């Protein structure tokens, strides 16, 4: 996590007219770039990014607002957000699953005893797209999962056009997903977290 810890300011006696400057200084004490797990308080910001990213393309969202709050309450450690100066710009939300393949139930359930992390959604704010942020976030997220001993693999479903993107991170196609949304069909992919655990242990991160 990249963060800045500002020193406690001393009492200063400054001339009038400096309030705007001080306000600017205070804003600059926020971390320029920070990665952290999300909290239920981040749910609205996450949903706004998700809705804009998915509605125009597929007409539906992977997670509704109440479902985002649900997962961020039950398993915040399976999420990761990228913040720029305190504002959420990209995120991933996951939960645990305890079966080999995804089912309709896996869209809304968190199975605490599961060994599989189900990635429900990866979304990037429109202002920050086409900058590689989704790739950076996914790489960090997989390393984050690799640091959790109970999690053995990650699974997700995506449209066929996105399969090559996820294959670059070690995901392998398992075939058609049993889940459909209207006329949309998906490919199910899985990724062993062993390599990400090894890379994390040997990267000094």
Swiss-Prot record:
Subunit structure as annotated in this protein's UniProt entry: Monomer. Interacts with several 14-3-3 proteins, including YWHAB, YWHAE, YWHAG and YWHAZ, preferentially when phosphorylated at Thr-29. Phosphorylation on Ser-203 also allows binding to YWHAZ, but with lower affinity. The interaction with YWHAZ increases affinity for arylalkylamines and acetyl-CoA and protects the enzyme from dephosphorylation and proteasomal degradation. It may also prevent thiol-dependent inactivation.
Record family assignment: Belongs to the acetyltransferase family. AANAT subfamily.
Record PTM Phosphoserine, positions in chain: 203
Major subcellular location class: cytoplasm
Gene3D superfamilies on file: 3.40.630.30
Record carries keyword tRNA-binding: no
Tissues expressing this chain: Highly expressed at night in pinealocytes and in the retina. Expressed at very low levels in the hindbrain and midbrain.
Function: Controls the night/day rhythm of melatonin production in the pineal gland. Catalyzes the N-acetylation of serotonin into N-acetylserotonin, the penultimate step in the synthesis of melatonin.
Binding residues annotated for acetyl-CoA, in chain numbering: 122-124, 130-135, 166-168
Name of the protein: Serotonin N-acetyltransferase
Top-level taxon in the UniProt lineage: Eukaryota
Protein keywords: Acyltransferase, Biological rhythms, Cytoplasm, Melatonin biosynthesis, Phosphoprotein, Transferase
Gene coding for it: Aanat
Assigned EC number: 2.3.1.87
SUPFAM superfamilies for this protein: Acyl-CoA N-acyltransferases (Nat)
GO CC annotation: cytoplasm; cytosol; perinuclear region of cytoplasm
Entry's Gene Ontology BP terms: cellular response to cAMP; circadian rhythm; entrainment of circadian clock by photoperiod; melatonin biosynthetic process; N-terminal protein amino acid acetylation; photoperiodism; response to calcium ion; response to cAMP
Broad class of enzyme this protein falls into: transferase
Induction data: Exhibits night/day variations with an up to 150-fold increased expression at night. Up-regulation is due to a large degree to the release of norepinephrine from nerve terminals in the pineal gland and cAMP signaling pathway. Down-regulated by light-induced proteasomal degradation. In the retina, 10-fold increased expression at night.
Compartment(s) of residence: Cytoplasm
């Amino acid at each position: 996590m990249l963060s800045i810890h500002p020193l406690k300011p001393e009492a200063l006696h400054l001339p009038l007219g400096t309030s705007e400057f001080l306000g600017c200084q205070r804003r600059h004490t926020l971390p320029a770039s920070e990665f952290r797990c999300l909290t239920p308080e981040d749910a609205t910001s996450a949903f706004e990014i998700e809705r804009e990213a998915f509605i125009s393309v597929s007409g539906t969202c992977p997670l509704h607002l109440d479902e985002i709050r649900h997962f961020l309450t039950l398993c915040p450690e399976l999420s990761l957000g990228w913040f720029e100066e305190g504002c959420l710009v990209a995120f991933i939300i996951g939960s645990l699953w305890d079966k080999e393949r995804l089912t309709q139930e896996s869209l809304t359930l968190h199975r605490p005893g599961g060994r599989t992390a189900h990635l429900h959604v990866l979304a990037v704010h429109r202002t920050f797209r086409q900058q590689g942020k989704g790739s950076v976030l996914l790489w960090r997220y997989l390393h984050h999962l690799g640091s959790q001993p109970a999690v053995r693999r990650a699974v997700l479903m995506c449209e066929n056009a996105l399969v090559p993107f996820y294959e670059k991170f070690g995901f392998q196609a398992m075939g058609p997903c049993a889940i459909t949304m209207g006329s949309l069909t998906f490919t199910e992919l899985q990724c062993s977290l062993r390599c990400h655990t090894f890379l994390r242990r040997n990267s000094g991160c």
